Curated annotation (Swiss-Prot):
One of its GO terms (molecular function) is structural molecule activity. One of its GO terms (cellular component) is host cell cytoplasm. Homodimer. Homomultimer. Keywords: Capsid protein, Host cytoplasm, Outer capsid protein, Virion. This is Outer capsid protein P3. It is found in: Virion; Host cytoplasm. Belongs to the phytoreovirus inner capsid protein P3 family. Capsid protein which self-assembles to form the inner icosahedral capsid with a T=2 symmetry, and consisting of 60 P3 dimers. Its main location: virion. SUPFAM superfamilies: Reovirus inner layer core protein p3. It comes from Rice dwarf virus (isolate Akita).
Length: 1019
């Protein structure tokens, strides 16, 4: 599309530099007739300079198998006994969850116990995991040649896999023959074999010679659990949706070129001759929801800025001095005489003509991004015949959307004032004043501050005999009747400026078409439809009479009106015509004769709109609901058109340097679509509108993190929804309006697939909650602990107990209930208080520590058989710690414990919180590794040993031992079965081409159809 992905360093990375279309000049030649003379326009354009046609939102990198993050830890112990010597201690493998990537997803370290908060946190984490894990493709497994019996095999080199070296783990086995057998079986298990199928499905219609085949891959059985490999396996899907073979890129670039261009031969040869295993970033061909740009002032402003950069007009003009000298002879200027006609000669402004032409061009490319502010629009401006004539011609060159409704109303009223002052009879004026149709001519303030269309009111109240005014107004409104002129096209409540858009405010401009029915320039419609692009086109600036001759009907219409206004006589002469009629008439006649020179502007605009016609910022639909303050404004002086009339040289070869961006310019549109898609994803996961649960600041933070991952740049949601570009303050109504708008265009498939992948990862991770150290409840007891010194099992002691020895005497429903019990205070005596929660705790039966450690056969046995407990239904996380007990007993271990007072402090710290954080409960487990020592004395029952194990006793807040998800294997084959997963890897890594530039060249001299009306899309 049009945003670069993140580049990479080193040969181990997939290159994510995107395919761009480089600088290329072409000269499509349009040949057509103007006034029976041959005319050629040459457009020199740079096709999509640095315009990106592909993107990799989640750039891939390569890792070796040894770099895969491990989800499980392995502890090896030899189980003995503190009561007797065990001649053949059982070698046991303890597999437990490691603090790793799933902790981040499950919110182990921080955040809230509030379920919606966890859900939103996990959605956010998933997208960072796409980058951190799913985008890392396992591309290398170390292997070596070995034998199984007499059969040669390729076995995985286990000694390069760190703590997953299964040969090293096998060496812990008690007997040498067991070690040898286990290591021999490792070579059988962990092998390189033929791949059953191709793991990467690109889905492109490729020639057989460049299609991926299974014999290019091998499958490796490796000492990793399939859960540990699962996230990395998703890299294959990310590869196939973001990359493709160069021939796919060639077909895409060839199809998007207009029929007068083709790809450079060297580029074509490079792309079409690419061999198997070569990849390039995949072109993005799906459509964006282009109308979203009108929902955000930032997006609209960025698009407007891009448009202004792409307008380049080259007008061929005469020397100012030559024009002034020629016109000086017409008006008979002497050195000591100044009149209105001669005074205008000093106003010849070359730069002003260029400014007007650029303003006209941007108004034609998109009517929604800017508006003009007419300077010099005084009440009596039409009395200045140069100003009035230029303003009338300017109206013929611009769509009504180029000016605000207020300015167009002011022009109508200034014209009405001129007609009443100079062309109306005294009787007509008196009658209209008496009927309150108009104000008295000398009521300047009322005329200037008037908010109604006086011209329409006059038109509607003229008598049949008042033909002069009737004809002038009818001509101005392009033949529309008074009733038609008053017709409301867009009601005030549908405009951002609260004014009715009437036909009277549109008819004087361009063709006289209503503002909501501006004609599109459809020359490239077929080309765009062939590319599945929307029929968005610039506004049509002129019609074609036939034989590709540009029509000057708009200019002829206005010159007829100007002639009637100034050259057919006045009822009351304007002051500028007194004693200057001859020179004024001479200059104005020359002016009207020269108006066809404005064809030079038509030509330049047509060339520019053609060159820019496929850009996303083009539009011919006026959107009245866009606030005025969102748009760019530009001051324009109609009198600058004076030099355009006299100085522009039409029928000349015009060099136009417009730059078509094709699909560039859609960055903000894509970001807005992603913002909406992520918001909808959060809504689906939460089951309700996120803003109903969280502050918008929290929601925006999550959206920004996710979208930033997908577009590889930091974004700020608030900046897209402000009152205007100048205010910079967030507008909640704009945001709400954005959410209310129906989704008109789904996300490009690339992003839809990535978001679907993220959803799959989310569901996959959610299914693994059983291995995560989070529990839905915990228990409060007076005392706890577990000791089994005489056991030959793997657990010899613990700071917690098994759930079956707990006797629940009270249940606390949730955090609010616990908080309420804590806040129910009562006086104990004159100096102290207690609370209901403490009373509940104090009522529990107490068990002495001696019952946990000094007991028959070294095992904890309680007098009453069970321990009184309070069950608290609050989510908690447990912090698991292993201590390997080898029988030294020299220094008591440091065992973390959580006491009832700690829980009270937790409640006091968060009593005003609506969403409490997770309570962390430590669990320490002593592993039986007593089989590592042969000392008899260490196994004697003694007070010292009892004192040592008393370190495990005393916790009052606990999570039962059986909640901890550990796997205990006494057979090495069971451990091997648990740690056996498969990865399929390409023997030769993909060759990813970096930064290929697609250069277009012209196909000779190819005529381009000028007729902007002749290729209209079907209705």
């Amino acid at each position: 599309m049009d945003s670069t992905g993140r580049a990479y360093d080193g040969a181990s990375e997939f290159k994510s530099v995107l395919v761009t279309e480089g600088t290329s000049h072409y000269t499509p030649v349009e040949v057509y007739n103007i006034l029976d003379e041959l005319k050629t326009i040459k457009i020199t354009s740079t096709i999509a300079e640095q315009s990106v046609v592909s993107r990799t939102p989640i750039p891939l990198s390569k890792i070796g198998l040894q770099d895969v993050k491990k989800l499980f830890d392995i502890n090896v112990i030899k189980c003995g006994s503190s009561l007797r010597i065990v001649d053949e201690p059982q070698v046991t493998f303890i597999v437990s969850y490691a603090k790793d990537i799933y902790d981040k997803f499950m919110c182990i370290e921080h955040d809230s116990a509030y379920e919606p908060s966890l859900t939103m946190h996990r959605v956010r984490v998933i997208y960072s995991m796409l980058n951190d894990y799913c985008a890392k493709m396992i591309s290398e497994v170390p292997y070596e040649s070995s034998f199984v019996g007499e059969l040669p095999v390729k076995s995985v080199t286990l000694n390069k896999l760190g703590d997953r070296n299964m040969d090293a783990l096998a060496e812990h086995l008690l007997f040498e023959h067991d070690v040898v057998n286990a290591q021999r079986e490792n070579r059988i298990f962990y092998q390189r074999k033929s791949a059953p199928a191709v793991p990467v499905i690109f889905g492109d219609d490729l020639e057989p010679a460049v299609r991926e085949r299974a014999n290019l891959y091998h499958r490796y059985s490796v000492p990793y659990h399939q859960i540990e490999l699962a996230l990395h396996a998703l890299a294959n899907d990310l590869l196939s949706i973001q990359y493709c073979h160069p021939t796919v890129v060639y077909n895409y670039l060839s199809s998007r070129a207009p029929n007068f261009l083709r790809l450079d031969d060297q580029v074509s040869l490079k792309l079409t001759s690419a061999g198997i295993g070569t990849l390039m970033p995949r072109p993005v061909v799906q459509l964006l929801d282009y109308d979203l740009v009108y929902m955000s002032p930032l997006a609209l402003n960025n698009l407007a800025s891009r448009l202004l950069r792409k307008i380049s007009l080259h007008l061929v003009m005469q020397m100012v001095t030559a024009v002034q000298q020629d016109l000086g002879e017409v008006v008979s200027v002497s050195s000591n005489v100044t009149n209105p006609a001669s005074a205008c000669l000093v106003r010849m402004n070359v730069q002003g003509v260029q400014t007007l032409a650029v303003f006209i061009a941007q108004s034609m490319l998109n009517p929604n991004i800017s508006y003009g502010m007419i300077s010099g629009l005084t009440l009596d401006c039409f009395s200045n015949f140069i100003y009035g004539a230029c303003l009338m011609l300017f109206q013929a060159l611009i769509p009504p959307s180029a000016l605000t409704a207020r300015q167009r109303l002011d022009i109508n009223n200034r014209f009405a004032y001129f007609l009443i002052k100079c062309h109306a009879t005294q009787a007509t004026t008196a009658r209209l004043v008496a009927n309150q149709v108009i104000y008295p001519v000398d009521a300047i303030d009322q005329w200037q501050s008037n908010g109604r269309d006086v011209l329409v009111a006059i038109y509607n109240n003229l008598l049949p005999g008042e033909l002069v005014l009737t004809n002038l107004i009818q001509t101005y409104f392009r033949g529309n009747t008074a009733q038609q002129a008053a017709e409301i096209l867009i009601p005030a409540d549908q405009t951002s400026y609260g004014a009715n858009e009437t036909r009277a405010l549109s008819a004087p401009y361009l063709f006289g078409a209503p503002i909501n029915m501006l004609a599109p320039d459809a020359r490239l419609s077929t080309y765009k439809r062939d590319l599945a692009l929307p029929d968005r086109s610039p506004i049509l600036i002129t019609t074609v009479e036939g034989q590709n001759s540009i029509s000057i009907e708009n200019l002829r219409h206005k010159t007829g009106l100007i002639r009637a206004m100034y050259l057919n006589g006045f009822v009351t002469q304007p002051p500028a015509w007194i004693r200057n009629a001859n020179s004024n008439t001479a200059l104005l006649s020359r002016f009207l004769d020269a108006t066809p020179n404005l064809l030079g502007i038509y030509e330049a605009i047509l060339a520019n709109t053609y060159a820019n016609a496929v850009n996303v910022y083009c539009d011919s639909v006026y959107r009245a609901d866009i606030p005025i303050e969102w748009k760019l404004h530009q001051s324009v002086d109609p009198q600058d058109l004076l030099f355009g009339v006299f100085g522009i040289v039409p029928q000349y070869q015009i060099l136009n340097e417009a730059v078509p961006d094709f699909f560039a310019g859609g960055e903000d549109i894509l970001i807005l679509q992603l913002i909406r898609a992520v918001y909808d994803t959060l809504s689906n996961k939460l089951g309700r509108n996120p803003a109903d649960i969280f502050h918008l600041e929290e929601v925006f933070k999550v959206i920004e993190e996710i979208v930033s991952v997908l577009v590889q740049q930091k974004i700020d949601v608030r900046k897209y929804f402000t009152e205007s570009m100048r205010s910079g303050s967030f507008s909640k109504p704009r945001w709400d309006n954005f959410l209310r708008r129906p989704v008109a265009q789904r996300l490009p498939n690339l992003y839809s697939v990535i978001m679907t992948q993220a959803d799959h990862v989310y569901n996959y991770m959610t299914q693994l909650t059983h291995i995560i150290p989070i529990t839905d409840c915990f228990y409060i007891v007076k005392n706890s602990g577990f000791v089994d010194r005489g056991s030959t099992g793997p657990v010899i002691a613990s700071s917690s107990v098994y759930e079956n020895v707990l006797k629940v005497v009270h249940t606390i429903a949730d955090f609010d209930a616990a908080n309420a019990l804590r806040l129910q205070r009562r006086r104990v005596d004159n100096t102290s208080y207690t609370d209901s929660l403490s009373d509940m705790f104090n009522g529990l039966r107490s068990i002495s520590s001696s019952e946990f450690v000094r007991s028959v056969n070294g095992r904890s046995v309680f007098t009453e058989g069970r321990i009184d407990a309070i069950k608290v239904n609050m989510r908690a996380k447990f912090d698991l710690q292993f201590i390997t007990e080898e029988g030294g007993y020299s220094k008591p271990p440091n065992v973390k414990k959580l006491m009832f007072s700690d829980f009270l402090s937790f409640l006091d710290s968060h009593k005003s919180d609506y969403r409490p954080p997770l309570l962390t409960v430590p669990i320490t487990i002593g592993l039986n590794n007593l089989g590592e020592t042969n000392s008899n004395t260490l196994r004697m029952r003694s007070e010292a040993i009892d004192e040592y194990f008393s370190s495990y006793v005393g916790a009052q807040i606990l999570v039962p031992i059986n909640v901890v998800d550990t796997r205990v294997y006494t057979e090495f084959s069971e451990l091997r079965n648990f740690f056996t997963g498969d990865v399929v890897i390409r023997d030769d890594p993909f060759d990813v081409w970096d930064g290929v530039k697609a250069t277009y060249i012209p196909i000779g001299v190819h005529g381009v159809r000028l007729d902007p009306n002749g290729d209209q899309p079907p209705l």
